[in-house]
Amino acid sequence: MRFLYPTFTVEKYDAYLTEMIPHNYKQIAVFEQDVCVGISGLWSGTKLWSGKYMEIDNFIVHPDHRKKGVGKMMTDYVDAKAKETGCTMIVLDAFTENFTAHRFYYNQGYVPKGFHFLKIINKEGLS
C-alpha cells in the first residue's frame, strides 16, 4: 500500500479492512518467495445501468516488479473471476496523472467511460 499511499499506516489499513470486508470486499495478491509483489482489492455489486459488475480497487504492483507480468497475472485473474461470477463488466479508477497505469489498463482492454466526480467533505480523512 505504501507505494500508492506513502503515509498509510498499518493501523489505518487494518481499521479500513475491518470496515470493508463485511461489505463484499476481497483482496488478491501475488507473492514471490513470501514477499507480496502485487495486491488489489475487489468489490462486486449490482447497478441499474450495468447489472452485476466487479470493481478493481487500489491495484498496486511493487515498483521493482513492474513490467514482469505481475499486473497481467492479476488482471487475468480478475477477468476470470468476473466471468465466473456472472459480471457484465469490470470497472476501476486511476488517478488522472497516473499515465503509466492508463497505458497498462488500455493494454488490458480497459477504456475510459465518463468521469468519476467527487466532492471532498473532509480533506484530513483522505489517504
Regions found by a protein language model. Name each.
Residues 1-51, 120-121:
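Acetyl-CoA-dependent GNAT
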Residues 45-56, 66, 112-113:
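A conserved beta-turn-beta hairpin within the catalytic core of GNAT-like acetyltransferases
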Residues 59-61, 94:
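Hydrophobic adenine-recognition pocket in adenosine-nucleotide-binding enzymes
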Residues 61, 67-80, 103, 107:
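Conserved acetyl-CoA-binding loop-helix of GNAT-fold acetyltransferases
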Residues 75, 82-94:
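Conserved GNAT acetyl-CoA-binding A-motif
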Residues 83, 111, 115-127:
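Terminal substrate-recognition subdomain of acyl/acetyltransferases
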Residues 87, 96, 105-115:
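Conserved acetyl-CoA-binding loop of GNAT-fold acetyltransferases
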Residues 91-101, 118-120:
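Conserved beta-strand-loop-alpha-helix junction that forms the acyl-donor binding cleft
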